[in-house]
């Protein structure tokens, strides 16, 4: 798995050839590619891995997505091996989705409970 974190200017700084090569290699190997905040738009879009996929990012960066991408406002979007999320307020849901994929749903549920996620 490769995870591209968000924030600015960090997301823009990830849009370099070395990161692009790494992302494309992970995609070719069928590995999970995860990204949050502005990074899906600024760092993943140039790699081509978002072409034809359903994706999300921090509001205002959507115009950087490829025309073939299906834009979503969901907190976390999973399309095949690519997982994207919107930003700081969705980071917990993003993290739990990664746990579901790396470990299993039961472990993610235990973490959710331990964090008092559903506590009133």
Model-derived regions: residue spans:
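Active-site-adjacent pocket-lining segments in enzyme domains
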Residues: 1-120
